[in-house]
Regions:
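Active-site anion-handling motifs in enzyme catalytic cores
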Residues: 1-137
Length: 137
């Protein structure tokens, strides 16, 4: 958390800091989701919050880089390839601001896209549980 404060919060302009909340500890799942539900969507680098967001129908843009694992590929699998960016690729990194603005400017379309992805996830979950039910009975 200290690195994040130093690299992010401390670098913000003085007029922006009063509108930003810095937390010294990780928040609990319910705290995170209650905030995400009130937002236009999420933009992040780790998969936990985006997964929770899509599970609630909240749009989520994900940025990854080579040192992270391939788990970001799940965004393509569930139909959110347009919301997955490889920050090691300059042309992809340059497209991030436009994607975030599009999400914010058309929240209805973004929520519809998130809902479609959630439906895909629910189908995978049903199919997986059906396999387990067959194998375990």
């Amino acid at each position: 958390m200290a690195v994040g404060k130093e690299m992010l919060y401390d670098q913000l302009p003085a007029d922006v800091k009063p509108r930003v909340v810095w937390r010294e500890k990780f928040w609990l799942t319910d705290e995170a989701l209650s905030t995400y539900r009130r937002s236009a969507g999420l933009f992040g680098h780790e998969m936990h919050s985006p997964i929770m967001s899509i599970g609630q129908g909240i749009p989520a843009i994900v940025c990854r880089w080579a040192e992270q694992t391939s788990k970001g590929d799940m965004w393509r699998t569930i139909g959110l390839g347009d919301w997955l960016f490889d920050l090691d690729q300059p042309e992809q990194a340059q497209r991030v601001p436009a994607a975030v603005l599009a999400l914010a400017k058309d929240p209805a379309a973004a929520r519809a896209q998130a809902a479609r992805a959630r439906t895909v996830v629910e189908r995978y979950q049903r199919d997986t549980m059906a396999v387990l039910a067959r194998k375990l009975t």
